[in-house]
A protein has these predicted regions:
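Low-complexity, intrinsically disordered regions enriched in charged/polar residues
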Residues: 1, 21, 38-45, 62
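Sec-dependent signal peptide recognition
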Residues: 1-7
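N-terminal signal peptide c-region/cleavage motif recognized by signal peptidases
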Residues: 13-15
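Immediate post-signal-peptide N-terminus of mature secreted/exported proteins
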Residues: 18-39
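Compact alpha-helical subdomains of small soluble proteins
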Residues: 42-87
């Protein structure tokens, strides 16, 4: 149930400037927080994959994708999260 609520919260935030570095950083911070809260890596990666599909489906530009990924990868490295590198 918590996972479903978290996914809904993420999806409602997607249209708000998804094409920015800080959005990617925010997603990474949320994902790292999920890991710290006891979610398995697989559960977190599944949420991230779902979010990625929704963002792409909504028509994010290639430039926006690069910015988001750069922010995400920067933040996961900075926080030392054991999450997959996105490209």
């Amino acid at each position: 149930m918590k996972r479903l609520l978290l996914l809904v919260a993420l999806l409602t935030a997607v249209p708000v400037q998804a094409e920015r570095y800080d959005f990617g950083q925010g997603v990474a911070a949320m994902a790292c927080s999920m890991l710290d809260s006891g979610y398995s890596r697989r559960e977190v990666e599944n949420v991230l994959d779902s979010l990625e599909r929704f963002i792409i489906r909504d028509g994010i530009s290639a430039r926006g994708q690069r910015q988001m990924v750069k922010g995400y990868n920067y933040q996961t490295a900075r926080l030392g999260c054991e999450l997959e590198y996105r490209d």
